[in-house]
C-alpha cells in the first residue's frame, strides 16, 4: 500500500477500536461520564501518536495491529490532557477541533472527571496488549506512566505555568516543550518498538526520533498560532502570543529554519530501521502543515 493508504488504514483502525471500547459501558448509570469522554476522544484529529506507534511496530517486523492497545492508551492520555488544558484554570479555551471544548458542553466538573477517567482507563487498555516478549510489559508500563506523569507531560505543563510571568531562555523553553509535547510522542514511538519486539538500540533510536520530531512539531504549532486562522486550526489563534515559545524568542523566520533542522535530525535517527519511507514522509508533512 502507498503512504496515503497506510495512513488511512492506521486511522480507521484506531477509530474503530476507540469507538468499540466504550460501547460496552453505555448502559452504566454514569453514562454522562462516558458521553463526555467520547465527545473529546472521538472528535477526530490527526491521530499522530497511534500512527507513530503502529509504524514503529511495523518497522520492527511485527504486525502493526499488535501495538493497538498501546496506541489507544497514548491517544486516551493525549485526549485527557487536551480536556484539562482547555479548562478555565489552565488555557481557558472555548474551542477545540472546530467545536466547543469539553467543559463548555458538559461543565467543568464533568470535564475534569472525563479527563481523569481517560487517564486511568488508558492503563486498563494498555494491559490487554500481547507482546512478542511479555517480559517487556513492565518496561512498557513504566514508559507510559513516566511520559504521562510528573517527569513527562504533566511536568511540562507545570513548567509552562511557572514560566508565564517571566522571560525564559532557550534551555528553559526546551525543557517545557520536550515534556509537554515530546513526552507522549516519545511514548508512542517507544511503545511501538516494544510492541514490535524491537531491540534496545531501536528503542533508543525511537526515543531520539521522538524528541526531535516533537520539538519540530511544537515549534510548528507555535508558528501556526501566529500565522494560521481559526478555520484552519479549529480553535482560536493568537492565544500563545504571551507564552514563552521559540516564536516569541526567535521570530518566525528562524523558527522555520529550526523546524527544518530538527525534522532532518529526526529522520536521521531512523537509519537503524528498515522501510522508513512512510515515516520520513510523515515527519516532513507534519512539520510543513497548516493545521
Pin down the residues of each PLM region.
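All-alpha prenyltransferase/terpene-synthase fold signal
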Residues: 1-291
